[in-house]
């Protein structure tokens, strides 16, 4: 290495953008590349989101549709592999009910629980929940357990 091939470290330097409004001699003084007059030249200007220059904007051209069903029930899903994990960790042995879901943080007190069929269940369990999928119910009964709907 010698003085003819010195270079700054990688990433230590970057090109600075030309500063605006710092005198005519800078090439970007005066109007600061904003042109003359008008709303766009003023400070604080920002184009409104969705504004299309006075044309009817897309969100008003497209019709509304659908509604929110106030009677919809939001289920908290718990899979079979979660139940098997509770058995493997020694948290449950024979019955799984809402108290177990709450203590193991799989659901809260106010949530409605639905047992889903992902994974496999090897243990014989008596499971109490609000709803079961067909595959989950079949898997619980195939393992010798019982599926009780609350």
UniProtKB/Swiss-Prot annotation:
Polar residues compositional bias, start-end: 1-15
Transmembrane segments: none
Pfam families: Ribosomal_L27A (PF00828)
GO CC list: cytosolic large ribosomal subunit
SUPFAM superfamilies associated with the record: Ribosomal proteins L15p and L18e
Coiled coil location: none
Keyword terms, alphabetized: Ribonucleoprotein, Ribosomal protein, RNA-binding, rRNA-binding
Region (Disordered) location: 1-52
Gly residues bias locations: 23-32
GO molecular function: rRNA binding; structural constituent of ribosome
Any GO BP: translation
Entries under HAMAP family matching the protein: Ribosomal_uL15
NCBIfam families: rplO_bact
Self-association and partners: Part of the 50S ribosomal subunit.
Similarity-based family: Belongs to the universal ribosomal protein uL15 family.
Function comment: Binds to the 23S rRNA.
Protein name, entry field: Large ribosomal subunit protein uL15
Gene name for this UniProt entry: rplO
């Amino acid at each position: 290495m010698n003085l003819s091939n010195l270079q700054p470290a990688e990433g230590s330097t970057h090109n600075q953008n030309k500063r605006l409004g710092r005198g005519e001699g800078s090439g970007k003084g005066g109007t600061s590349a904003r042109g003359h007059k008008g709303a766009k030249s003023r400070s604080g200007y920002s184009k409104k989101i969705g504004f299309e220059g006075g044309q009817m904007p897309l969100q008003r051209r497209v019709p509304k549709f659908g509604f929110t069903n106030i009677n919809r029930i939001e289920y908290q899903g718990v899979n079979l592999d979660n139940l098997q994990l509770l058995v493997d960790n020694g948290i449950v042995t024979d019955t799984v009910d809402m108290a177990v879901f709450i203590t193991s943080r799989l659901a809260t007190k106010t949530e409605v629980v639905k047992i889903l069929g992902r994974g496999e269940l090897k243990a014989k369990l008596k499971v109490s929940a609000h709803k079961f999928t067909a595959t989950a119910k079949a898997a619980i009964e195939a393992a010798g357990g019982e599926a009780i709907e609350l």
